[in-house]
Regions:
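An active-site-proximal structural segment forming one wall of the substrate-binding cleft
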Residues: 30-45, 49, 59-83, 88-89, ...
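Short, solvent-exposed loop/turn and secondary-structure capping segments
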Residues: 4-9, 49-50, 56-63, 178-181
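Active-site cleft segment of glycoside hydrolase catalytic domains centered on the general acid/base Glu
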Residues: 69, 102-116, 143-157
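Structural recognition of the beta-strand scaffold that forms the well-ordered cores
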Residues: 1, 17-20, 44-51, 137-140, ...
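Active-site-proximal helices and loops of the catalytic beta/alpha 8
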Residues: 35, 39, 53, 61, ...
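Conserved structured core elements
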Residues: 12, 25-29, 116, 120-123, ...
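Aromatic- and acidic-residue-enriched carbohydrate-binding clefts of CAZyme catalytic domains
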Residues: 2-36, 65-112
Length: 193
């Protein structure tokens, strides 16, 4: 997707337009042709989608649809990246909150999927790309940096439309216990998916 912040976002994850392929890589039509060509060769196609954060160059940053569209704090608050707070029953609530509401960087606002309209925006975004490009799967960037209930609702929204669709969440963990917590979570932890 389009990232208009190459100075701050060398990696392309500060999205400015979720519905446009970054022109450095081509166009929407070229992307759709690439997926079709892959399918002709029997290759499945998985797209990366980032529901956790966008970029400050996105139009909504200066004209938020709702004040709680993004997580806001009195001063800039970076995520502490303490994802273990999800699975550790002894973790401090403040650590988990800092993980799931803190911004990734000063140019990457943290989206609030707890806002039902923001959640629906991201569900419809995924549905649109699946249908437009004929995707076979989605890799969900920074999956555990969003509240479990919210990312679960996003996942359920997509699977409601496409029950057999492949979703793979990125979880940067370095030990078996933390990875296992997120593995096959379709019925674990009170319905978390």
């Amino acid at each position: 997707t389009l990232d208009n912040e190459p100075t701050y976002s060398y990696h392309g994850y500060a999205c400015a337009d979720y519905y446009q392929i970054d022109p450095r890589y081509g166009s929407n039509e070229l992307y759709r042709s690439l997926v079709a060509a892959a399918h002709e060769k029997g290759i499945k196609f998985i797209q990366d989608i980032v529901p956790n954060h966008s970029g400050t160059a996105h139009w909504w940053y200066n004209d938020l649809p709702f004040q709680d569209w993004i997580h806001q704090h009195p001063t800039f608050t970076r995520s502490n990246y303490a994802m273990s707070g999800h699975s550790d029953p002894h973790a401090a609530r403040t650590d988990l909150d800092a993980c799931v509401t803190g911004w990734f960087d000063t140019s990457m606002p943290d989206m609030n999927l707890g806002n039902p309209y923001c959640l629906q925006y991201y569900i419809q975004l995924a549905v649109w790309w699946i249908e437009y490009a004929d995707l076979d799967g989605i890799r969900v960037d920074t999956y555990p940096y969003t509240r479990k209930e919210d990312i679960s609702a996003w996942t359920e929204g997509i699977l409601k439309e496409f029950p057999n669709f492949t979703l793979v969440g990125e979880c940067w963990f370095h030990n078996t216990q933390q990875i296992a917590y997120w593995e096959g979570c379709r019925t674990a932890d009170g319905g978390f998916k």
